[in-house]
């Protein structure tokens, strides 16, 4: 009889900016903005904001502009450039996979068509014209087709930032729409047309707009489309001539929203605690004093929502970094990402953040905490904090911000990829990064296993625990025993036992601190036991 187990491994750096691919194309950048699986490959969008390789910041190579899309074909390959947007298009605010199931008339396709779409805008300061475009990958030959979404006169007072797209089926007409946000210009829509290059036919006028603040998120909940703009959440009223209405407003919390911070960020959908329907979830970040408050909106009747406070992320960070003060916190760059922990099968949603700190106790980069912090939310609305590549040291390269995260699309790999960095207005050359956390699957022959037959790890008690817990185990044979505490994504937290143990029952106490003697945040932790017979 054989069994398969997952073993948490150490973190692995997947991409570091400032290298060349197999075709000698430069891959740099100050930030990884998205990581997206598409047709058994992995794609990432790279921005060159504040990067000195960018010709707009003093770079000498005209081929290096604002943005690239890079590709990883399998887990053992190296990343390579797949699309270079040049020096005219600013950084790609959109990289997303969408799946069309119907054409522009509403007729169901014989088979769904899965497309990878990037989005960016291009201001021409000489002509005074700005255009916003989407780029659709042709998976047959690896090229990208450019489609115009918006074109108009450029104004420094307006935003043309493209931050999200969403496939949505109109519940009245049955037509599938590609919904695209273009800054303060509004919400645009397109339909699937396989007869044209790029396969998407955009409508030149917005469905809704202009807007006061650039939208930062679009989501579908309970078959309704919602998007955020500043302090407001809008709902689409379906039909031949759709319109939008405000269904929730956070202006009671702040009368002013700094457009560069955004207001409502990461608008996403989570299960309603009642067990029926879906709720909206978001991070509230209105201005330079933002502390990253998480709210859940539970739907009531007639498009009324019950606003539920879940947590303030800055307080979690201050608990995680004892003695530190968080002056500003930003996060939820994209969506609240849902995933299932491969070790426990528990369901979580994940966001990344950055924190401006003031006490100079911990490693920092231009006063931002250097570590890449991940915030996990379980289905009970409980939150915990973890770090990419473990707790950062003063000698480590700064990560600063976790912007994106996705499960591996590769058949032979159980892993989660994380990407990020955020220049925050500071010079940031070749700081973009991608790490992955991998779990290896090991097949063991239970009949021939020496270690599995000779020890038994029991449930810890008390559980839940505060501040300490006891772990009991028994040995039927003398062994060298290692017992280690891990967090949910495989970071090693604390080595509890690393010694030769005799036959019989044993107990070890964990006082809830990590290897550095710092108390860990509330959450779920895993115990691993290994035995080597002599």
Language-model-derived ranges and their functions:
Residues 20-65:
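Beta-strand-rich domains and repeat architectures in extracellular enzymes and scaffolds
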Residues 28-38, 90-113, 158-175, 214-222, ...:
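Structural signature of eukaryotic scaffold interfaces centered on beta-propeller domains
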Residues 40-45, 49, 103-124, 171-180, ...:
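Entry beta-strands of beta-propeller and related beta-repeat scaffolds
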Residues 52-71, 124-136, 185-193, 230-243, ...:
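Structural motif
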Residues 394-442:
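Blade-level signature of beta-propeller repeat domains, shared across WD40, Kelch, NHL, RCC1
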Residues 447-534:
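C-terminal outer-membrane/trafficking sorting elements
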């Amino acid at each position: 009889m054989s069994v398969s187990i997952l073993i948490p491994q150490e973190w692995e750096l997947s991409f570091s900016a400032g290298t060349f691919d197999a075709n000698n194309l430069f891959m740099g950048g100050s930030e990884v903005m998205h990581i997206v699986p598409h047709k058994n490959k992995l794609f990432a969008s790279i921005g060159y904001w504040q990067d000195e390789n960018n010709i707009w910041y003093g770079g000498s190579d005209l081929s290096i502009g604002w943005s690239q899309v890079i590709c990883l074909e399998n887990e053992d390959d190296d990343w390579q450039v797949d699309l270079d947007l040049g020096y005219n298009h600013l950084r790609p605010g959109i990289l997303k996979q969408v799946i069309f199931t119907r054409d522009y008339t509403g007729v169901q396709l014989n088979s769904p068509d899965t497309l990878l779409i990037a989005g960016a805008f291009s201001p021409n300061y000489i002509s005074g014209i700005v255009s916003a475009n989407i780029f659709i990958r042709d998976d047959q030959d690896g090229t990208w087709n450019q489609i115009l979404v918006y074109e108009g006169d450029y104004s420094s007072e307006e935003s043309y930032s493209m931050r999200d797209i969403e496939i949505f089926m109109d519940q009245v007409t049955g037509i599938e729409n590609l919904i695209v946000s273009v800054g303060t210009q509004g919400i645009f829509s397109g339909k699937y047309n396989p007869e044209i290059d790029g396969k998407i036919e955009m409508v030149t006028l917005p469905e809704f707009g202009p807007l006061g603040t650039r939208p930062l998120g679009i989501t579908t909940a309970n078959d309704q489309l919602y998007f955020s703009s500043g302090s407001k959440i809008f709902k689409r009223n379906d039909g031949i001539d759709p319109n939008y209405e405000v269904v929730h407003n956070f202006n009671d919390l702040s009368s002013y929203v700094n457009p560069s911070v955004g207001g409502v960020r990461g608008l996403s959908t989570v299960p309603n605690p009642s067990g029926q329907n879906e709720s909206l979830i978001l991070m509230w970040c209105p201005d330079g004093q933002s502390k990253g408050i998480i709210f859940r909106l539970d739907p009531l009747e007639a498009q009324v929502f019950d606003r539920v406070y879940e947590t303030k992320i800055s307080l979690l960070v201050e608990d995680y970094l004892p003695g530190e003060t968080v002056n500003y916190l930003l996060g939820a760059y994209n969506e609240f990402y849902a995933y299932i922990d491969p070790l426990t099968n528990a369901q979580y949603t994940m966001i990344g953040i950055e924190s401006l700190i003031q006490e100079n106790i911990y490693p920092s980069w231009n006063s931002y905490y250097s570590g890449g912090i991940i915030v996990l939310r379980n289905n009970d609305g409980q939150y915990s904090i973890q770090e990419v590549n473990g707790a950062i040291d003063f000698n480590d390269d700064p990560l600063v911000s976790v912007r994106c995260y996705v499960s591996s699309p590769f058949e032979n790999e159980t892993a989660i990829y994380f990407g990020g960095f955020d220049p925050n207005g500071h010079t940031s050359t070749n700081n973009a990064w991608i790490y992955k956390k991998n779990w290896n699957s090991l097949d063991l022959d239970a009949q021939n296993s020496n270690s599995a037959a000779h020890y038994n790890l029991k449930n810890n008690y008390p559980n839940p625990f505060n501040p300490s817990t006891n772990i009991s185990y028994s040995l039927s044979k003398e062994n060298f025993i290692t017992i280690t505490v891990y967090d949910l994504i495989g970071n090693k937290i604390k080595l509890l036992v690393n010694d030769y143990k005799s036959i019989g029952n044993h107990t070890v106490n964990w006082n809830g601190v990590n290897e550095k003697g710092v108390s860990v945040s509330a959450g779920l932790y895993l115990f691993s036991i290994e035995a080597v017979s002599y």
